[in-house]
């Protein structure tokens, strides 16, 4: 049986991709909750939607089937029993496992069509939308001045992070911060109950319930047997070890390269500072490299008796040459390595490049120095508008979850 998921590289021609079109959740963010929502700014929704539609059309124009998260989840919840189970879980994960507010939320959400219910959950539910018959003192007094019973999900359009497709399987991720943890419940129900994926042999390499944090922006599929993963603000060494154990036991993957990056908001994931764009070419933010192009990387392989062998290496080019069996590696610095341009363009996702075929990428138009440099290195660059989407702190790779890519020619 052919798996509906197949991703054996970062650069194989993109055939199927999952997106989420930004919606009302963006307009349910206000300045006092920016930090709580893990965002730095509030995009202007009409323009953000226009930009996202143009991004999606760019992918279609280059041969990709575009699926939308909200549609996949709607189809997964077609059965009333499954929908009821999902509602119980999402309401519990919003802080209301039982009680008057739980009951009020459930009644309110069931008043919508399934598609509108999904969109409402993403948008968030305000307290003034719910009428409760009775609430305990704790329910009434807790966060009395906070306007939401269910928080909005303004990061949902970054579909890279809730999961990651690796080979013929997927990780359904335990995300780091509460603001995003509910998002991967969507993935769980899509994989279990959407007819496109359910009972089709999709391996779940790691589900969302172990405590170790992991996010898809840190998971880079370098080949059909090599995975790179960031040890970052959002992904822990514990989760990387568990994923490596699963891949080594159940798949053809025999190498996991764990790369330590600064643990900060600007470089929250590996793909904000390092992306693969061709067989032997990568973008890299100079701030992660020490003198001589060095990093702290831990190369993991299957060891004896089910254990993992780990070696510490530092020369990024040599690590990649060996892992990919290439005579040379071209590391292209964000912003040309300029001390002002590089951090500015990295902040605006100049390193967050989405490859849609070998040597063909989608980038934000605002990062013109990095884009021109990519062209000088022989890369075909499709620029997309980005004035509003970039306010969310994620680029084209962040906004896309590849489901199927063509295998690379050997």
From Swiss-Prot:
Known catalytic reactions: L-arginine + H2O = L-citrulline + NH4(+)
Keyword Hydrolase attached: yes
Main localization category: cytoplasm
Gene3D superfamilies documented for this protein: Arginine deiminase, L-arginine/glycine Amidinotransferase, Chain A
SUPFAM superfamilies assigned to the protein according to its UniProt record, in alphabetical order: Pentein (SSF55909)
Keywords, comma-separated and alphabetical: Arginine metabolism, Cytoplasm, Hydrolase
UniProt pathway: Amino-acid degradation; L-arginine degradation via ADI pathway; carbamoyl phosphate from L-arginine: step 1/2
Residues the record marks as active site: 398 (amidino-cysteine intermediate)
Biological processes annotated in GO: arginine catabolic process to ornithine; arginine deiminase pathway
InterPro entries associated with the record: Arg_deiminase (IPR003876)
Organism: Limosilactobacillus reuteri (strain DSM 20016) (Lactobacillus reuteri)
Protein name stated in the entry: Arginine deiminase
UniProt family annotation: Belongs to the arginine deiminase family.
């Amino acid at each position: 049986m052919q798996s509906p998921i197949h991703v054996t590289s970062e650069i194989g021609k993109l055939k199927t991709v999952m997106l989420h079109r930004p919606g009302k959740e963006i307009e349910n963010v206000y300045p006092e909750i920016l930090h709580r929502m893990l965002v730095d700014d509030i995009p202007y929704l009409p323009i953000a939607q226009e930009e996202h539609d143009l991004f999606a059309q760019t992918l279609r124009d280059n041969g990709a089937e575009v699926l939308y998260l909200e549609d996949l989840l709607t189809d997964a919840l077609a059965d009333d029993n499954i929908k009821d189970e999902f509602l119980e879980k999402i309401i519990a994960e919003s802080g209301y496992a039982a009680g008057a507010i739980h009951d009020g939320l459930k009644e309110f959400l069931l008043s919508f069509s399934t598609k509108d219910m999904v969109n409402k959950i993403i948008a968030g539910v305000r307290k003034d939308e719910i009428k409760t018959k009775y609430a305990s003192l704790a329910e009434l007094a807790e966060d009395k001045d906070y306007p939401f019973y269910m928080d909005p999900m303004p990061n949902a359009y970054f579909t890279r992070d809730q999961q990651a497709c690796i080979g013929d399987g997927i990780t359904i991720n335990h995300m780091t911060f509460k603001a995003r943890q509910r998002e991967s419940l969507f993935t769980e129900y899509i994989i279990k109950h959407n007819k496109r994926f359910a009972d089709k042999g999709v391996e779940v390499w790691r589900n969302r319930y172990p405590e170790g944090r992991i996010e898809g922006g840190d998971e880079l599929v370098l080949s059909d047997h090599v995975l790179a993963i960031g040890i970052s603000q959002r992904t822990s060494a514990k989760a990387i070890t568990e994923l490596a154990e699963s891949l080594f036991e159940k798949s053809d993957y025999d190498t996991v390269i764990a790369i330590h990056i600064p643990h900060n908001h600007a470089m929250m994931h590996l793909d904000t500072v390092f992306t693969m764009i061709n067989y032997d070419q990568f973008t890299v933010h100079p701030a992660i490299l020490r003198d001589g192009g060095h990093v702290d990387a831990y190369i993991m392989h299957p060891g004896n008796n089910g254990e993992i062998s780990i070696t510490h290496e530092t020369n990024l080019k040599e690590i990649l040459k060996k892992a990919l069996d290439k005579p040379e590696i071209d590391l292209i610095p964000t912003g040309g390595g300029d001390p002002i341009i590089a951090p500015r363009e990295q902040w605006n996702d100049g390193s967050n490049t989405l490859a849609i075929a070998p040597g063909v990428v989608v980038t934000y138009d605002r990062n013109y120095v990095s884009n021109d440099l990519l062209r000088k290195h022989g890369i075909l660059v499709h620029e997309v508008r980005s004035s509003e989407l970039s306010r969310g702190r994620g680029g084209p790779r962040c906004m896309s979850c590849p489901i199927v890519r063509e295998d690379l020619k050997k």
